Regions:
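Auxiliary Fe-S-binding modules of radical SAM enzymes
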Residues: 1-68, 99, 103, 133-144, ...
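Small/polar loops that bind or transfer phosphate-bearing groups
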Residues: 71-72, 149, 282
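Short, glycine/serine-rich, charged loops/turns that create anion-binding
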Residues: 76, 119-122, 154, 220, ...
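Core AdoMet radical
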Residues: 84-101, 107-198, 212, 216, ...
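Local cysteine-cluster metal-coordination motifs and their immediate loop/turn environment
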Residues: 49-61, 72-87
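Glycine/Thr-rich phosphate-binding loops of Rossmann-like dinucleotide-binding domains
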Residues: 79, 123, 182, 251, ...
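Conserved functional loop/turn residues at catalytic and ligand-binding sites
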Residues: 75, 79, 84, 109, ...
Length: 303
C-alpha cells in the first residue's frame, strides 16, 4: 500500500522562524518496493546514498527499482555541515564491491546506474580505482547500461581524475554544493575553485563525457551569488545542472535559512537555460541523481 508521509529522518520540522514546512516538500513512498531494494543491498553488502544521505526521493526511486550506489563504504573522511553521511575512520576498500554493484544492477534491470562515494581522503587515489573497477564490472554484466559517476574532488589530483575518465562513464558529476561565499562554512574541507577545476579538467580532457554539477538553495545565499555561481560553472564547460532545496538533516547540521518556492526553482531553471546549460533539473526535491537518466537522454544528441 502506498502512503504519503513526511519522513522525520530527512524532512525535518521547519525552524520556528520559518513557519510550517511547505506542502511541496511532502514525499510518497511504497514500503514494499523500498524493503525489496533494501534487502538486495544488504545481501550484497552494498550502500546506497539514498539511505545514507536520507534522500527525500528514496521512495520514488525504489518504487521504480532504481538506486544510487555509494561505493567505498558508508563512512566519510570529511564532515560537511549539510550532509547526513557519517564522518569517521573508513573501513578498508571492499575488493568484492565492484562486482556486487554490477550484480545488483543486473538484478534490478537498471538501464542507467549512478555511482557515488563517501569522500576517501585516506586513499592516495581518492577512490578513483574503485570507481574504474565498478564501471568495468557493470559493463561486463550489464552491456548497454549507461553509467554516471558522482565523484568527490579527489583533492584535485588530475591523475585520480584520469583513472575515472579512462573508464569512460557517460556522465561525470561533481557537485559545487553551494555558492562561493558559503563554501567555508558549509563544506570546510573542500574548496570552490578546486571543484570548478575538477569540472573544467574533466570536460577539457574528455569532451565526449557529459559533465554535471549541482547546488542547494536555502543556506543563506543571495540571488546575485546564485547568478555568479551559474556563470562560474558554465565557464568550465559543464553540460548539466541540478538545483534543489537544502533540507537540514538534524539540528546539529547547518541551519536552514529559507524555503525556496516552486516559482523560485522555475526561475532558476529558466535563467540557467538562457545562460547556456544544456539540461537543468531545478525543483524543491531535485537531487544530483534524481531522474538522472532523463538528463542523459536530454543531452544525448549533443555529441
Amino acid at each position: 500500500m502506498e502512503k504519503t508521509m513526511e519522513k522525520a529522518e530527512d524532512l525535518q520540522a521547519a525552524p520556528p522562524s520559518l513557519g510550517k514546512k511547505p506542502d511541496w516538500l511532502k514525499v510518497r513512498y511504497n514500503q514494499e518496493a523500498t524493503e525489496e531494494v533494501a534487502a538486495l543491498m544488504k545481501d550484497l553488502r552494498l550502500n546506497t546514498v539514498c539511505k545514507e544521505a536520507n534522500c527525500p526521493n528514496m521512495g520514488e526511486c525504489y518504487r521504480k527499482h532504481t538506486a544510487t550506489f555509494m561505493i567505498l563504504g558508508s563512512v566519510c573522511t570529511r564532515n560537511c555541515r549539510f550532509c547526513n553521511v557519517s564522518c569517521g575512520r573508513p573501513e578498508a576498500v571492499d575488493e568484492e564491491e565492484p562486482m556486487n554493484v554490477a550484480k545488483a544492477a543486473k538484478q534490478l534491470h537498471l538501464k542507467h546506474v549512478v555511482l557515488t562515494c563517501s569522500t576517501r581522503d585516506d586513499l592516495e587515489d581518492g577512490g578513483a580505482l574503485q570507481f574504474a573497477k565498478t564501471i568495468r564490472a557493470i559493463r561486463e554484466l550489464c552491456p548497454g547500461t549507461t553509467i554516471e559517476t558522482l565523484i568527490s574532488d579527489m583533492k584535485g589530483r588530475t591523475e585520480s581524475l584520469d583513472i575515472v575518465l579512462e573508464a569512460k562513464p557517460e556522465v561525470l558529476n561533481h557537485n559545487v554544493e553551494t555558492v562561493k561565499e558559503l563554501q567555508r562554512a558549509v563544506r570546510p574541507q573542500a574548496a570552490y575553485e578546486r571543484s570548478l577545476g575538477v569540472l573544467r579538467y574533466c570536460k577539457q580532457h574528455s569532451p565526449d563525457i557529459r559533465v554535471k554539477t549541482g547546488f542547494m538553495v536555502g543556506l543563506g545565499e543571495t540571488e546575485e551569488q546564485i547568478d555568479r555561481l551559474m556563470d562560474d560553472v558554465l565557464e568550465t564547460g559543464c553540460d548539466i545542472l541540478t538545483i534543489g532545496q537544502y533540507l537540514q538533516p538534524t539540528k546539529e547540521h547547518y541551519p536552514l535559512a529559507r524555503y525556496a518556492t516552486p516559482e523560485d526553482f522555475a526561475r532558476y531553471k529558466k535563467n540557467a537555460l538562457l545562460k547556456g546549460f544544456h539540461h537543468v533539473a531545478s525543483a524543491p526535491l531535485a537531487r544530483s541523481s534524481y531522474r538522472a537518466w532523463e538528463a542523459l537522454e536530454d543531452v544525448h544528441g549533443l555529441y
